[in-house]
């Protein structure tokens, strides 16, 4: 799962409110309907490779590296000040301003922390101006350590504390090998995940710098974006894997109830947390459905079927 088979992207840098540069890549034809992809914790643009490959033929696909991930450097602020939900929203606003024209609308898709980014930005003028619809994919608004089932204990304070300790560990992840892939698969993917997809996810996650991994883990441990969730007053689809240990389906169901305009909930049987990699066709289909409905886009494949 790489971006090497795609045409070279148009790369640019968006500058966030605190001066942090954000690496952005744009795929697909200029002037095509826009999709903005926001990845999750410890991932990068490469996490969306299958969606970019499928959508870039008839969409302008905008993907960016969250600060501290991929080619976006860590914030200059020390002591964790550069890691916050405000920073997530600032970075997304900067990306929208750098890539979309005045009044231009896009479908936004966020996976895990990328979905939290969209919730954090819900009240921002840029989101209201540019977002036509949203896909919240394998994410949650609050109570992340309380609801996660990575630690195989009954719900309660001990499980929550152990989960926070595991996810917030400062130790390096080490090399990608059979043991590390087994651990990553258990924590983040469904039991039937193909070895190649486990390998791809492991390489992406292990490439995340330790400082960014730890800095963002502290934000996620205390996350509360329930107000932002309720402020997403636009069409929002929700997707989750039934075997997700990091953001179990309880989060998706809470979001469905809280969202002012939820278009539906998709639960993918047997899939874990890494749904864009584990079930790329299903995630891409949800994005296409949103672009068709809210941007009036008909895919090239649908056009061929009509002409046949």
Language-model segments: which ranges?
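Conserved alpha/beta-hydrolase catalytic His-Asp/Glu region
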Residues: 142, 169-230
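Short beta-strand/loop motif that positions the catalytic acidic residue
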Residues: 232, 238-240, 244
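Conserved alpha/beta-hydrolase "acid-adjacent" motif
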Residues: 245-251
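Conserved HGGG/HGGXW glycine-rich cap/lid loop of the alpha/beta-hydrolase fold
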Residues: 20-81, 95
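Conserved alpha/beta-hydrolase "nucleophile elbow" surrounding the catalytic nucleophile
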Residues: 39-41, 106, 110-116, 241
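Catalytic active-site module of serine/aspartate enzymes centered on a nucleophile-bearing elbow/loop
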Residues: 261-308
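Active-site loop/oxyanion-hole signature of alpha/beta-hydrolase fold enzymes
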Residues: 17, 63-113, 122-123, 285
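Flexible "cap/lid" loop of the alpha/beta hydrolase fold
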Residues: 123-168
